[in-house]
Regions:
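Bacterial N-terminal signal peptides that target proteins for export
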Residues: 2-15
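Long, contiguous binding/interaction regions
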Residues: 31-156, 163-302, 308-344
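C-terminal multi-pass transmembrane helix bundles with aromatic-rich, positive-inside signatures
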Residues: 6, 23-25
């Protein structure tokens, strides 16, 4: 005779539920264990990972030219539109500032996922500033810096850095709208003026300057200019490489005579280079006139410094060389990229 255990209905239900819960708990534990054992992917920069995952197509430069209405310059996959401010007559300490001395608006197009990233530097008068920055915002672009390049300049001009991202046609259309707003506020096309388009006198001993600075410059309309890249720093903005052609460089523009010269320029520096570069320039009689950023999402952090010096040309060059020696110390200064036309 078999003995049968008869359970009450409530006990039977509880027993069944306990079994179901045990199976569920075991399944959850196994799933969590598998998740914990799965190799983790290091994601220090989501933007950079996004760039790696998405394909990047070459720029449609013909579309940019057609939309913006002017030809640019192509360099290593990037395309730059430059607008010399020939309508502005500016002097600093008796020296005429022409486009080659740092008086040009430019917008650079770089290949990016789904189109292009643009970065630009707009030369604006005080009357231009408000309407142009309104146009930038209305177009959905960003303003990343507003600053001076000179002091004691007449008339006063400001420099506004902008950025944007989208399809090539879209960002080209936005760029054209901003450039058109500048034409509207000025009442003319800055590139077609003749106020600052002429050459200036320059009797500098450029070979002596080259020897002191250890670079070779380029002469443009009486301005002898050096542009020095920073290949020792792998700079990115939103995961996109920022090149010398895109404005990531140190430059120096000389004019005048051997005994009475002027030099204007821009230093690009990492955060640890800022203090020693400023100290060295000032100790060598070169005036620091601005310290600022150009970008806001760059990695690593980069600062830009504008300077102005008047005096004996070779003494100015020695001071600049001493300041250059404060940068790129982790890597040799030899071999840094340079082209006098990288920064227009």
């Amino acid at each position: 005779m078999h003995n049968h255990i008869i359970m009450k209905p409530s006990i039977r239900v509880a027993f069944i539920l306990t079994g179901i819960f045990s199976h569920f708990l075991l399944f959850a534990q196994q799933k969590q264990k598998a998740k914990d054992e799965k190799p983790k992917t290091k994601t220090e920069n989501p933007d950079m990972n996004t760039v790696r995952m998405k394909s990047i197509s070459p720029l449609d430069t013909l579309a940019i030219e057609r939309i913006v209405g002017m030809k640019g310059k192509f360099n290593n996959g990037e395309y730059k539109i430059t607008v010399p401010q020939n309508d502005l007559s500016i002097e600093v300490d008796g020296f005429k500032i022409i486009p080659a001395m740092g008086l040009s608006t430019w917008i650079d197009f770089a290949p990016a996922p789904d189109g292009a990233m643009i970065m630009g530097d707009l030369v604006l008068t005080e009357n231009d500033l408000k309407p142009v920055q309104q146009a930038v915002i209305q177009q959905g672009l960003t303003i990343t810096a507003i600053h001076n390049h000179f002091v004691r300049n007449h008339p006063d001009v400001m420099y506004m850095h902008i950025g944007g991202w989208g399809s090539t046609e879209t960002v080209a259309t936005k760029a054209k709208a901003v450039l058109d707003k500048i034409k509207e506020t000025r009442g003319n096309d800055p590139s077609k003026g003749n106020t600052s388009s002429e050459s200036i006198n320059n009797s500098l001993n450029t070979q002596a300057l080259d020897k002191l600075l250890q670079y070779k410059g380029e002469m443009t309309k009486g301005v002898y200019k050096y542009t020095i890249g920073r290949p020792d720093v792998q700079l990115r903005e939103h995961g996109i490489p920022v090149t010398s052609f895109m404005g990531f460089n140190t430059w120096a523009a000389f004019q005048g005579t051997p005994d009475h010269a002027a030099v204007a320029g821009d230093f690009t520096m990492t955060e640890d280079e800022v203090a020693p570069v400023i100290k060295t320039l000032i100790e060598n009689g070169i005036e620091v006139v601005a310290l600022h950023n150009h970008m806001v999402h760059e990695q690593p952090r980069i600062f830009f410094l504008h300077y102005w010096g008047v005096g004996n040309a070779e003494e100015l060059a020695k001071g600049l060389r001493a300041a250059l020696n404060q940068t790129g110390k982790k890597n040799s200064m030899q071999g840094m990229g340079m082209s006098g036309k990288d920064h227009q």
